[in-house]
Amino acid sequence: MSVKWTSVILLIQLSFYFSSGSCGKVLVWAAEYSHWMNMKTILEELVQRGHEVTVLASSASILFDPNNSSALKIEVFPTSLTKTEFENISMQEVKRWIELPKDTFWLYFSQMQEIMWRFGDIIRNFCKDVVSNKKLMKKLQESRFDVVFADPIFPCSELLAELFNIPLVYSLRFTPGYIFEKHCGGFLFPPSYVPVVMSELSDQMTFMERVKNMIYMLSFDFYFQMYDMKKWDQFYSEVLGRPTTLSETMGKADIWLIRNSWNFQFPHPLLPNVDFVGGLHCKPAKPLPKEMEEFVQSSGENGVVVFSLGSMVTNMEEERANVIASALAQIPQKVLWRFDGKKPDTLGLNTRLYKWIPQNDLLGHPKTRAFITHGGANGIYEAIYHGVPMVGIPLFADQPDNIAHMKTKGAAVRLDFDTMSSTDLANRLKTVINDPLYKENVMKLSRIQHDQPVKPLDRAVFWIEFVMRHKGAKHLRPAAHDLTWFQYHSLDVIGFLLACVATVIFVIMKCCLFCFWKFARKGKKGKSD
Protein backbone atom coordinates (compact mmCIF):
# COMPACT_ATOMS: atom_id res chain seq x y z
CA MET A 1 0.00 0.00 0.00
CA SER A 2 1.35 3.45 -0.92
CA VAL A 3 2.29 6.02 1.70
CA LYS A 4 -0.51 8.24 0.37
CA TRP A 5 -3.27 5.71 1.04
CA THR A 6 -1.77 4.81 4.42
CA SER A 7 -1.97 8.48 5.40
CA VAL A 8 -5.59 8.73 4.23
CA ILE A 9 -6.64 5.67 6.27
CA LEU A 10 -4.82 7.02 9.32
CA LEU A 11 -6.59 10.37 9.01
CA ILE A 12 -9.98 8.63 8.72
CA GLN A 13 -9.27 6.60 11.85
CA LEU A 14 -8.20 9.70 13.73
CA SER A 15 -11.35 11.53 12.62
CA PHE A 16 -13.47 8.76 14.13
CA TYR A 17 -11.40 8.77 17.29
CA PHE A 18 -11.87 12.49 17.80
CA SER A 19 -15.38 12.66 16.37
CA SER A 20 -16.79 13.70 19.74
CA GLY A 21 -14.55 16.75 19.78
CA SER A 22 -11.48 17.33 21.94
CA CYS A 23 -11.11 14.68 24.61
CA GLY A 24 -12.21 15.77 28.06
CA LYS A 25 -11.51 14.94 31.68
CA VAL A 26 -14.36 13.49 33.74
CA LEU A 27 -14.42 13.37 37.54
CA VAL A 28 -16.76 10.70 38.91
CA TRP A 29 -18.17 10.51 42.43
CA ALA A 30 -18.48 6.75 42.90
CA ALA A 31 -21.74 4.91 43.59
CA GLU A 32 -22.33 1.34 44.77
CA TYR A 33 -24.11 -1.82 43.59
CA SER A 34 -26.56 -1.42 40.67
CA HIS A 35 -26.08 2.36 40.68
CA TRP A 36 -22.43 1.85 39.80
CA MET A 37 -23.17 -0.80 37.16
CA ASN A 38 -25.09 1.73 35.07
CA MET A 39 -22.55 4.50 35.58
CA LYS A 40 -19.71 2.14 34.65
CA THR A 41 -21.38 1.36 31.31
CA ILE A 42 -21.38 5.06 30.45
CA LEU A 43 -17.84 5.61 31.71
CA GLU A 44 -16.42 2.72 29.70
CA GLU A 45 -17.99 4.20 26.58
CA LEU A 46 -16.45 7.59 27.40
CA VAL A 47 -13.03 5.93 27.72
CA GLN A 48 -13.58 4.21 24.36
CA ARG A 49 -14.10 7.67 22.86
CA GLY A 50 -10.81 8.90 24.23
CA HIS A 51 -11.89 10.74 27.38
CA GLU A 52 -9.96 10.54 30.63
CA VAL A 53 -12.13 9.28 33.50
CA THR A 54 -11.12 9.54 37.16
CA VAL A 55 -13.31 7.80 39.74
CA LEU A 56 -13.21 9.19 43.28
CA ALA A 57 -13.91 6.27 45.63
CA SER A 58 -13.55 5.74 49.37
CA SER A 59 -11.24 3.10 50.81
CA ALA A 60 -14.43 1.40 52.10
CA SER A 61 -15.95 1.09 48.63
CA ILE A 62 -17.36 -2.38 48.04
CA LEU A 63 -16.94 -2.52 44.26
CA PHE A 64 -13.53 -0.95 43.73
CA ASP A 65 -10.17 -2.64 43.94
CA PRO A 66 -7.37 -0.22 43.02
CA ASN A 67 -5.07 -3.19 42.37
CA ASN A 68 -7.21 -4.41 39.46
CA SER A 69 -6.28 -3.10 36.04
CA SER A 70 -8.91 -0.85 34.51
CA ALA A 71 -9.23 1.83 31.86
CA LEU A 72 -10.74 3.98 34.60
CA LYS A 73 -8.38 5.85 36.91
CA ILE A 74 -9.36 5.12 40.52
CA GLU A 75 -8.51 7.82 43.07
CA VAL A 76 -9.00 6.25 46.51
CA PHE A 77 -9.37 8.50 49.54
CA PRO A 78 -8.99 7.19 53.12
CA THR A 79 -11.99 6.97 55.41
CA SER A 80 -12.53 5.67 58.94
CA LEU A 81 -14.96 2.97 57.80
CA THR A 82 -13.45 -0.28 56.53
CA LYS A 83 -14.65 -2.14 53.45
CA THR A 84 -15.93 -5.02 55.60
CA GLU A 85 -17.79 -2.68 57.96
CA PHE A 86 -19.43 -0.84 55.06
CA GLU A 87 -20.49 -4.09 53.39
CA ASN A 88 -21.86 -5.48 56.67
CA ILE A 89 -23.84 -2.29 57.33
CA SER A 90 -25.22 -2.36 53.78
CA MET A 91 -26.29 -5.99 54.09
CA GLN A 92 -27.83 -5.38 57.54
CA GLU A 93 -29.88 -2.45 56.30
CA VAL A 94 -31.00 -4.28 53.17
CA LYS A 95 -32.09 -7.25 55.32
CA ARG A 96 -33.88 -4.84 57.65
CA TRP A 97 -35.64 -3.19 54.70
CA ILE A 98 -36.77 -6.57 53.34
CA GLU A 99 -38.24 -7.45 56.75
CA LEU A 100 -40.09 -4.15 57.26
CA PRO A 101 -43.73 -4.57 58.43
CA LYS A 102 -45.58 -3.72 55.21
CA ASP A 103 -49.04 -3.96 56.79
CA THR A 104 -48.55 -0.90 59.03
CA PHE A 105 -47.98 2.19 56.89
CA TRP A 106 -46.56 4.58 59.47
CA LEU A 107 -44.27 1.99 61.06
CA TYR A 108 -43.05 0.87 57.65
CA PHE A 109 -42.48 4.44 56.56
CA SER A 110 -40.66 5.61 59.67
CA GLN A 111 -38.33 2.58 59.71
CA MET A 112 -37.60 2.99 56.01
CA GLN A 113 -36.59 6.60 56.64
CA GLU A 114 -34.26 5.50 59.45
CA ILE A 115 -32.51 3.20 56.98
CA MET A 116 -32.14 6.02 54.46
CA TRP A 117 -30.82 8.39 57.14
CA ARG A 118 -28.19 5.87 58.21
CA PHE A 119 -26.95 5.55 54.64
CA GLY A 120 -27.08 9.35 54.39
CA ASP A 121 -24.84 9.69 57.45
CA ILE A 122 -22.29 7.29 55.93
CA ILE A 123 -22.18 9.11 52.58
CA ARG A 124 -21.94 12.46 54.37
CA ASN A 125 -18.91 11.20 56.32
CA PHE A 126 -17.33 10.06 53.04
CA CYS A 127 -17.91 13.54 51.65
CA LYS A 128 -16.36 15.15 54.73
CA ASP A 129 -13.31 12.91 54.34
CA VAL A 130 -12.85 14.16 50.77
CA VAL A 131 -13.28 17.91 51.25
CA SER A 132 -11.15 17.90 54.41
CA ASN A 133 -8.30 16.13 52.59
CA LYS A 134 -6.36 19.22 51.44
CA LYS A 135 -3.73 17.26 49.53
CA LEU A 136 -6.37 15.37 47.55
CA MET A 137 -8.47 18.49 46.91
CA LYS A 138 -5.40 20.34 45.61
CA LYS A 139 -4.60 17.43 43.29
CA LEU A 140 -8.16 17.38 41.95
CA GLN A 141 -8.17 21.16 41.53
CA GLU A 142 -4.94 21.07 39.53
CA SER A 143 -6.30 18.28 37.31
CA ARG A 144 -8.71 20.80 35.75
CA PHE A 145 -11.63 18.47 35.10
CA ASP A 146 -14.26 19.41 32.52
CA VAL A 147 -17.29 17.84 34.20
CA VAL A 148 -18.40 16.00 37.33
CA PHE A 149 -20.53 12.90 36.78
CA ALA A 150 -22.46 11.17 39.58
CA ASP A 151 -25.61 9.51 40.86
CA PRO A 152 -27.29 12.06 43.19
CA ILE A 153 -28.61 9.34 45.48
CA PHE A 154 -25.02 9.44 46.80
CA PRO A 155 -24.67 13.21 47.42
CA CYS A 156 -21.37 15.13 47.38
CA SER A 157 -20.68 15.51 43.65
CA GLU A 158 -22.61 18.79 43.57
CA LEU A 159 -20.39 20.14 46.35
CA LEU A 160 -17.25 19.15 44.40
CA ALA A 161 -18.64 20.76 41.24
CA GLU A 162 -19.31 23.95 43.21
CA LEU A 163 -15.83 23.98 44.79
CA PHE A 164 -14.08 23.34 41.46
CA ASN A 165 -16.49 25.56 39.48
CA ILE A 166 -17.18 22.94 36.80
CA PRO A 167 -20.41 21.58 35.23
CA LEU A 168 -22.33 18.68 36.73
CA VAL A 169 -24.19 15.80 35.06
CA TYR A 170 -26.38 13.39 37.02
CA SER A 171 -27.26 9.78 36.24
CA LEU A 172 -30.24 8.70 38.32
CA ARG A 173 -32.79 5.91 38.57
CA PHE A 174 -34.92 7.61 41.25
CA THR A 175 -34.82 8.93 44.80
CA PRO A 176 -37.47 7.85 47.36
CA GLY A 177 -40.64 9.86 46.80
CA TYR A 178 -38.91 11.76 43.94
CA ILE A 179 -37.52 14.04 46.67
CA PHE A 180 -34.34 15.16 44.91
CA GLU A 181 -36.04 15.29 41.52
CA LYS A 182 -38.77 17.61 42.81
CA HIS A 183 -36.99 19.80 45.33
CA CYS A 184 -33.58 19.93 43.67
CA GLY A 185 -34.23 19.33 39.98
CA GLY A 186 -37.56 21.12 39.71
CA PHE A 187 -39.23 18.07 38.13
CA LEU A 188 -43.01 18.07 37.80
CA PHE A 189 -44.95 15.17 39.35
CA PRO A 190 -48.64 16.14 39.63
CA PRO A 191 -50.00 13.72 42.27
CA SER A 192 -53.38 13.62 40.53
CA TYR A 193 -52.05 11.30 37.82
CA VAL A 194 -48.35 10.61 38.50
CA PRO A 195 -47.90 7.88 41.14
CA VAL A 196 -45.15 8.55 43.67
CA VAL A 197 -42.29 6.10 43.31
CA MET A 198 -42.57 3.22 45.82
CA SER A 199 -46.34 3.71 46.13
CA GLU A 200 -47.01 0.69 43.82
CA LEU A 201 -49.76 2.66 42.06
CA SER A 202 -50.43 3.18 38.35
CA ASP A 203 -51.42 6.35 36.50
CA GLN A 204 -55.06 5.13 36.47
CA MET A 205 -55.94 5.86 40.10
CA THR A 206 -59.27 5.74 41.88
CA PHE A 207 -60.18 8.50 44.34
CA MET A 208 -58.84 6.54 47.33
CA GLU A 209 -55.65 5.70 45.43
CA ARG A 210 -55.15 9.41 44.74
CA VAL A 211 -55.60 9.99 48.47
CA LYS A 212 -52.95 7.33 49.15
CA ASN A 213 -50.66 8.89 46.55
CA MET A 214 -50.99 12.32 48.18
CA ILE A 215 -50.25 10.87 51.63
CA TYR A 216 -47.13 9.13 50.28
CA MET A 217 -45.94 12.34 48.64
CA LEU A 218 -46.47 14.46 51.76
CA SER A 219 -44.87 11.81 53.98
CA PHE A 220 -41.71 11.67 51.86
CA ASP A 221 -41.58 15.47 51.72
CA PHE A 222 -41.94 15.78 55.49
CA TYR A 223 -39.37 13.18 56.51
CA PHE A 224 -36.68 14.20 54.05
CA GLN A 225 -37.23 17.96 54.12
CA MET A 226 -37.52 18.32 57.89
CA TYR A 227 -34.71 16.00 58.95
CA ASP A 228 -32.17 14.52 56.53
CA MET A 229 -31.84 17.49 54.19
CA LYS A 230 -31.15 19.84 57.09
CA LYS A 231 -27.97 17.91 57.89
CA TRP A 232 -26.78 18.31 54.31
CA ASP A 233 -27.75 22.00 54.28
CA GLN A 234 -25.66 22.66 57.38
CA PHE A 235 -22.68 20.67 56.09
CA TYR A 236 -22.65 22.35 52.66
CA SER A 237 -23.00 25.80 54.24
CA GLU A 238 -19.99 25.13 56.48
CA VAL A 239 -17.81 23.93 53.58
CA LEU A 240 -18.77 26.74 51.18
CA GLY A 241 -18.63 29.42 53.88
CA ARG A 242 -22.05 30.82 53.00
CA PRO A 243 -25.67 29.86 53.65
CA THR A 244 -26.85 27.33 51.10
CA THR A 245 -28.95 24.18 50.83
CA LEU A 246 -28.65 20.77 49.24
CA SER A 247 -31.58 21.70 46.99
CA GLU A 248 -29.86 24.85 45.75
CA THR A 249 -26.55 23.09 45.12
CA MET A 250 -28.12 20.09 43.38
CA GLY A 251 -30.34 22.44 41.40
CA LYS A 252 -27.26 23.72 39.57
CA ALA A 253 -26.82 20.40 37.75
CA ASP A 254 -26.66 20.95 34.00
CA ILE A 255 -28.16 17.65 32.82
CA TRP A 256 -30.18 14.90 34.52
CA LEU A 257 -29.90 11.50 32.80
CA ILE A 258 -32.79 9.46 34.19
CA ARG A 259 -32.44 5.70 33.87
CA ASN A 260 -36.05 5.27 32.84
CA SER A 261 -38.03 4.98 29.61
CA TRP A 262 -41.57 5.52 28.45
CA ASN A 263 -42.20 1.80 27.97
CA PHE A 264 -41.49 1.41 31.69
CA GLN A 265 -42.56 4.69 33.27
CA PHE A 266 -46.00 6.30 33.19
CA PRO A 267 -46.16 9.55 31.16
CA HIS A 268 -45.47 12.83 32.96
CA PRO A 269 -43.92 16.22 32.08
CA LEU A 270 -40.15 16.54 31.61
CA LEU A 271 -37.85 19.57 31.73
CA PRO A 272 -35.49 20.42 28.84
CA ASN A 273 -32.37 19.45 30.82
CA VAL A 274 -33.72 15.93 31.48
CA ASP A 275 -33.35 12.90 29.22
CA PHE A 276 -34.58 9.32 29.69
CA VAL A 277 -31.80 6.76 29.10
CA GLY A 278 -33.34 3.65 30.64
CA GLY A 279 -31.90 0.35 29.46
CA LEU A 280 -28.56 1.86 28.45
CA HIS A 281 -26.77 -1.23 29.75
CA CYS A 282 -28.79 -3.64 27.58
CA LYS A 283 -27.03 -5.34 24.68
CA PRO A 284 -27.41 -8.37 22.40
CA ALA A 285 -26.82 -11.76 24.00
CA LYS A 286 -23.42 -13.43 23.74
CA PRO A 287 -22.88 -17.20 23.49
CA LEU A 288 -23.27 -19.09 26.77
CA PRO A 289 -20.52 -21.14 28.42
CA LYS A 290 -20.40 -24.64 26.92
CA GLU A 291 -21.81 -26.49 29.96
CA MET A 292 -24.63 -23.98 30.35
CA GLU A 293 -25.49 -24.06 26.64
CA GLU A 294 -25.72 -27.86 26.73
CA PHE A 295 -28.10 -27.70 29.69
CA VAL A 296 -30.26 -25.09 27.93
CA GLN A 297 -30.37 -27.14 24.72
CA SER A 298 -31.39 -30.24 26.69
CA SER A 299 -34.68 -28.50 27.54
CA GLY A 300 -36.05 -29.23 24.07
CA GLU A 301 -39.28 -27.49 23.08
CA ASN A 302 -40.17 -26.64 26.68
CA GLY A 303 -37.32 -24.17 26.99
CA VAL A 304 -35.82 -22.73 30.17
CA VAL A 305 -36.68 -20.40 33.04
CA VAL A 306 -34.09 -17.95 34.39
CA PHE A 307 -34.28 -17.22 38.13
CA SER A 308 -32.35 -14.54 40.02
CA LEU A 309 -33.12 -12.48 43.11
CA GLY A 310 -30.13 -10.20 42.59
CA SER A 311 -26.68 -9.84 44.10
CA MET A 312 -27.77 -8.35 47.43
CA VAL A 313 -29.80 -11.34 48.60
CA THR A 314 -27.70 -14.14 50.09
CA ASN A 315 -28.28 -17.00 52.51
CA MET A 316 -31.98 -17.52 51.82
CA GLU A 317 -33.84 -19.31 54.62
CA GLU A 318 -34.04 -23.07 54.06
CA GLU A 319 -37.84 -23.10 54.34
CA ARG A 320 -38.25 -20.49 51.56
CA ALA A 321 -35.59 -22.13 49.40
CA ASN A 322 -37.38 -25.49 49.66
CA VAL A 323 -40.74 -23.91 48.78
CA ILE A 324 -39.21 -22.36 45.66
CA ALA A 325 -37.29 -25.51 44.66
CA SER A 326 -40.44 -27.61 45.04
CA ALA A 327 -42.35 -25.25 42.75
CA LEU A 328 -39.62 -25.28 40.10
CA ALA A 329 -39.62 -29.09 40.13
CA GLN A 330 -43.29 -29.05 39.04
CA ILE A 331 -42.76 -27.33 35.67
CA PRO A 332 -41.56 -29.03 32.44
CA GLN A 333 -38.98 -26.32 31.72
CA LYS A 334 -35.34 -26.52 32.78
CA VAL A 335 -34.39 -23.85 35.36
CA LEU A 336 -31.16 -21.93 35.85
CA TRP A 337 -31.25 -20.50 39.37
CA ARG A 338 -28.73 -18.02 40.71
CA PHE A 339 -28.42 -19.24 44.28
CA ASP A 340 -25.74 -18.93 46.95
CA GLY A 341 -26.59 -21.12 49.92
CA LYS A 342 -27.31 -24.64 51.08
CA LYS A 343 -28.76 -26.85 48.34
CA PRO A 344 -32.55 -27.20 48.90
CA ASP A 345 -33.74 -30.70 49.77
CA THR A 346 -36.64 -30.40 47.31
CA LEU A 347 -34.48 -29.41 44.33
CA GLY A 348 -35.72 -31.11 41.15
CA LEU A 349 -33.62 -32.69 38.41
CA ASN A 350 -34.73 -29.92 36.05
CA THR A 351 -33.06 -27.20 38.15
CA ARG A 352 -29.40 -26.22 38.32
CA LEU A 353 -27.89 -23.85 40.87
CA TYR A 354 -25.27 -21.27 39.97
CA LYS A 355 -23.50 -18.72 42.16
CA TRP A 356 -23.45 -16.45 39.12
CA ILE A 357 -25.24 -16.48 35.80
CA PRO A 358 -24.76 -14.43 32.60
CA GLN A 359 -28.25 -13.00 33.03
CA ASN A 360 -28.38 -10.84 29.89
CA ASP A 361 -27.11 -13.69 27.70
CA LEU A 362 -29.62 -16.14 29.17
CA LEU A 363 -32.53 -13.73 28.74
CA GLY A 364 -31.49 -13.24 25.13
CA HIS A 365 -31.40 -16.98 24.44
CA PRO A 366 -34.21 -18.18 22.10
CA LYS A 367 -35.12 -21.00 24.50
CA THR A 368 -35.83 -18.71 27.48
CA ARG A 369 -39.56 -18.76 28.32
CA ALA A 370 -39.79 -16.75 31.56
CA PHE A 371 -37.76 -14.75 34.06
CA ILE A 372 -38.30 -15.01 37.82
CA THR A 373 -36.97 -11.75 39.20
CA HIS A 374 -36.85 -9.65 42.36
CA GLY A 375 -37.80 -6.64 40.25
CA GLY A 376 -34.51 -4.78 40.04
CA ALA A 377 -34.59 -2.18 37.27
CA ASN A 378 -31.53 -3.60 35.48
CA GLY A 379 -33.03 -7.07 35.23
CA ILE A 380 -36.43 -5.77 34.14
CA TYR A 381 -34.86 -3.70 31.36
CA GLU A 382 -32.94 -6.74 30.15
CA ALA A 383 -36.17 -8.78 30.15
CA ILE A 384 -37.93 -6.02 28.18
CA TYR A 385 -35.00 -5.72 25.77
CA HIS A 386 -35.11 -9.45 24.99
CA GLY A 387 -38.91 -9.81 25.26
CA VAL A 388 -39.16 -12.23 28.20
CA PRO A 389 -42.30 -12.25 30.43
CA MET A 390 -41.71 -12.06 34.17
CA VAL A 391 -42.76 -13.50 37.51
CA GLY A 392 -41.96 -10.82 40.07
CA ILE A 393 -41.01 -11.57 43.67
CA PRO A 394 -40.11 -8.08 44.92
CA LEU A 395 -38.16 -7.67 48.16
CA PHE A 396 -37.40 -4.01 48.93
CA ALA A 397 -36.81 -0.46 47.67
CA ASP A 398 -38.25 0.22 44.19
CA GLN A 399 -38.70 -3.47 43.36
CA PRO A 400 -42.43 -3.68 44.31
CA ASP A 401 -43.01 -0.51 42.30
CA ASN A 402 -41.16 -1.87 39.25
CA ILE A 403 -43.17 -5.09 39.29
CA ALA A 404 -46.38 -3.07 39.71
CA HIS A 405 -45.48 -1.18 36.52
CA MET A 406 -44.85 -4.40 34.61
CA LYS A 407 -48.05 -5.95 35.95
CA THR A 408 -50.04 -2.89 34.82
CA LYS A 409 -48.53 -3.26 31.35
CA GLY A 410 -49.44 -6.96 31.25
CA ALA A 411 -45.85 -8.22 31.12
CA ALA A 412 -45.59 -9.77 34.59
CA VAL A 413 -47.38 -11.36 37.53
CA ARG A 414 -46.49 -10.79 41.16
CA LEU A 415 -45.97 -13.00 44.22
CA ASP A 416 -45.14 -12.22 47.83
CA PHE A 417 -41.85 -13.79 48.91
CA ASP A 418 -42.91 -14.38 52.53
CA THR A 419 -46.35 -15.88 51.90
CA MET A 420 -46.21 -17.65 48.52
CA SER A 421 -46.56 -21.42 48.41
CA SER A 422 -45.04 -23.89 45.97
CA THR A 423 -48.40 -24.14 44.23
CA ASP A 424 -48.63 -20.35 43.89
CA LEU A 425 -45.24 -20.08 42.23
CA ALA A 426 -45.78 -23.08 39.95
CA ASN A 427 -49.20 -21.79 38.83
CA ARG A 428 -47.92 -18.25 38.17
CA LEU A 429 -45.04 -19.63 36.14
CA LYS A 430 -47.37 -21.79 34.05
CA THR A 431 -49.65 -18.79 33.48
CA VAL A 432 -46.84 -16.54 32.26
CA ILE A 433 -45.37 -19.26 30.03
CA ASN A 434 -48.60 -20.66 28.57
CA ASP A 435 -50.74 -17.52 28.23
CA PRO A 436 -49.57 -15.86 24.96
CA LEU A 437 -50.84 -12.46 26.12
CA TYR A 438 -47.88 -11.99 28.46
CA LYS A 439 -45.41 -12.69 25.67
CA GLU A 440 -47.28 -10.35 23.32
CA ASN A 441 -47.29 -7.54 25.87
CA VAL A 442 -43.60 -7.81 26.71
CA MET A 443 -42.72 -8.02 23.01
CA LYS A 444 -44.62 -4.78 22.47
CA LEU A 445 -42.51 -3.14 25.18
CA SER A 446 -39.41 -4.65 23.57
CA ARG A 447 -40.24 -3.21 20.15
CA ILE A 448 -40.68 0.23 21.73
CA GLN A 449 -37.34 -0.12 23.53
CA HIS A 450 -35.55 -0.96 20.28
CA ASP A 451 -37.39 1.64 18.19
CA GLN A 452 -35.38 4.72 19.19
CA PRO A 453 -33.54 7.07 16.80
CA VAL A 454 -30.51 7.13 19.12
CA LYS A 455 -29.59 4.40 21.59
CA PRO A 456 -29.87 5.35 25.30
CA LEU A 457 -26.13 4.83 25.88
CA ASP A 458 -25.23 7.06 22.94
CA ARG A 459 -27.61 9.76 24.21
CA ALA A 460 -26.08 9.62 27.68
CA VAL A 461 -22.57 9.97 26.30
CA PHE A 462 -23.69 12.74 23.94
CA TRP A 463 -25.00 14.87 26.79
CA ILE A 464 -21.83 14.47 28.84
CA GLU A 465 -19.74 15.46 25.82
CA PHE A 466 -22.16 18.31 25.08
CA VAL A 467 -21.67 19.70 28.58
CA MET A 468 -17.89 19.43 28.23
CA ARG A 469 -17.91 21.15 24.83
CA HIS A 470 -20.09 24.04 25.95
CA LYS A 471 -18.83 24.35 29.54
CA GLY A 472 -22.29 23.51 30.84
CA ALA A 473 -25.89 23.60 29.65
CA LYS A 474 -27.34 26.56 31.55
CA HIS A 475 -29.53 27.45 28.57
CA LEU A 476 -31.58 24.31 29.36
CA ARG A 477 -31.89 25.04 33.07
CA PRO A 478 -35.39 26.35 33.96
CA ALA A 479 -35.63 29.72 35.71
CA ALA A 480 -37.80 27.99 38.32
CA HIS A 481 -34.60 27.24 40.24
CA ASP A 482 -34.14 30.96 40.89
CA LEU A 483 -37.61 31.48 42.36
CA THR A 484 -38.73 31.15 45.95
CA TRP A 485 -41.46 28.62 46.69
CA PHE A 486 -44.16 31.30 46.84
CA GLN A 487 -42.95 32.86 43.58
CA TYR A 488 -42.88 29.43 41.90
CA HIS A 489 -46.53 28.84 42.84
CA SER A 490 -47.37 32.49 41.97
CA LEU A 491 -48.70 33.05 45.49
CA ASP A 492 -47.35 36.61 45.44
CA VAL A 493 -49.16 37.31 42.14
CA ILE A 494 -52.36 35.69 43.41
CA GLY A 495 -52.08 37.71 46.62
CA PHE A 496 -51.56 40.92 44.64
CA LEU A 497 -54.55 40.23 42.37
CA LEU A 498 -56.74 39.37 45.36
CA ALA A 499 -55.64 42.60 47.01
CA CYS A 500 -56.53 44.53 43.84
CA VAL A 501 -59.95 42.88 43.67
CA ALA A 502 -60.50 43.52 47.38
CA THR A 503 -59.48 47.17 46.93
CA VAL A 504 -61.88 47.65 44.01
CA ILE A 505 -64.70 46.00 45.97
CA PHE A 506 -63.86 48.15 48.99
CA VAL A 507 -63.88 51.37 46.89
CA ILE A 508 -67.17 50.41 45.21
CA MET A 509 -68.76 49.63 48.57
CA LYS A 510 -67.54 52.92 50.00
CA CYS A 511 -68.91 54.80 46.99
CA CYS A 512 -72.25 53.03 47.32
CA LEU A 513 -72.41 53.77 51.03
CA PHE A 514 -71.49 57.41 50.38
CA CYS A 515 -74.20 57.74 47.71
CA PHE A 516 -76.72 56.01 49.96
CA TRP A 517 -75.78 58.34 52.80
CA LYS A 518 -76.11 61.37 50.49
CA PHE A 519 -79.52 60.33 49.16
CA ALA A 520 -80.73 59.41 52.61
CA ARG A 521 -79.65 62.77 53.98
CA LYS A 522 -81.25 64.61 51.06
CA GLY A 523 -84.50 62.69 51.57
CA LYS A 524 -84.61 63.61 55.24
CA LYS A 525 -83.96 67.26 54.40
CA GLY A 526 -86.81 67.28 51.84
CA LYS A 527 -89.26 65.85 54.39
CA SER A 528 -88.33 68.43 56.98
CA ASP A 529 -89.00 71.24 54.47
From Swiss-Prot:
Which biological process terms from the Gene Ontology are attached to this UniProt entry?
bile acid catabolic process; lipid catabolic process
Q: Which reaction does it catalyse?
A: glucuronate acceptor + UDP-alpha-D-glucuronate = acceptor beta-D-glucuronoside + UDP + H(+)
User: Where would you find this protein in the cell?
Assistant: Microsome membrane; Endoplasmic reticulum membrane
Q: Which GO terms describe its molecular function?
A: glucuronosyltransferase activity
| Sugar-bearing residue positions | 67-68, 88
What Pfam families does the record tag this protein with?
A: UDPGT
Keywords tagged on the record: Bile acid catabolism, Endoplasmic reticulum, Glycoprotein, Glycosyltransferase, Lipid degradation, Lipid metabolism, Membrane, Microsome, Signal, Steroid metabolism, Transferase, Transmembrane, Transmembrane helix
Q: Which SUPFAM superfamilies has this protein been placed in?
A: UDP-Glycosyltransferase/glycogen phosphorylase (SSF53756)
Instruction: Locate the transmembrane regions by residue number.
Output: 494-514
According to the record, the signal peptide region is 1-21
- Per its UniProt record, what InterPro entries does this chain match? UDP-glycosyltransferase, UDP_glucos_trans, UDP_glycos_trans_CS
Provide the membrane topology annotation.
Single-pass membrane protein
Q: Which coarse location class applies to the principal site listed for this UniProt protein? A: membrane
Provide the E.C. number(s) assigned to this enzyme.
2.4.1.17
For this UniProt entry, what's an example GO CC term? endoplasmic reticulum membrane
Its function, per the record, reads: UDPGT is of major importance in the conjugation and subsequent elimination of potentially toxic xenobiotics and endogenous compounds. This isozyme is active on C18, C19, and C21 steroids, bile acids, and several xenobiotics including eugenol, 1-naphthol, and p-nitrophenol.
Family as reported in the entry's similarity comment: Belongs to the UDP-glycosyltransferase family.
Query: What is the official name of this protein in its record?
Result: UDP-glucuronosyltransferase 2B9
Q: What organism does the record attribute this protein to?
A: Macaca fascicularis (Crab-eating macaque)
**Gene from which the chain derives:** UGT2B9
